[in-house]
Amino acid sequence: DVYKRQIRIGERTNVQDGSILHCDPPRPGDPDGSPLVIGDDVLIGHMAMVHGCTIHDRGFVGLGAIAMNKAVIGSDAMLAAGAMLTENKVMGERELWAGRPAKKLRDLDDAAVMGMRAGVMHYTQNAKDHAAAIKS
């Protein structure tokens, strides 16, 4: 669903199978609507729903997680599998949130952040390998 360019997906972002990406157009009382803005190097797990939210660079959305309108996932932050980040909630940088509704569990350490970055590199290499294979 794209309304006047209201969905943006950044470089090297990976969206897994079965995920839903959606936005809401402007409407009375909400002249800007709820665009979906996904930064660079983001990982979105299988069957996730991201709906009119913002995911900053290197954010992570776990399998089956939901992020609602105007929610924000900070840089290097992780929304756990199955979590629901409700409307207007804001996750800070390097935070782990889980539950329904999602709440902050803790800050992420360097090892967790590096693990997410390794995932980005893995999927980026998969894309390059696939592109090379179909050219041959």
Regions of interest found by a model, annotated:
Residues 43:
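Short proline/glycine- and basic residue-enriched helix-capping loop/turn segments at helix->loop/beta transitions
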Residues 2-3:
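Short, small-residue-biased leader/transition segments that mark boundaries at the very start
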Residues 6, 11, 16-24, 28-38, ...:
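Glycine-rich hexapeptide-repeat left-handed beta-helix
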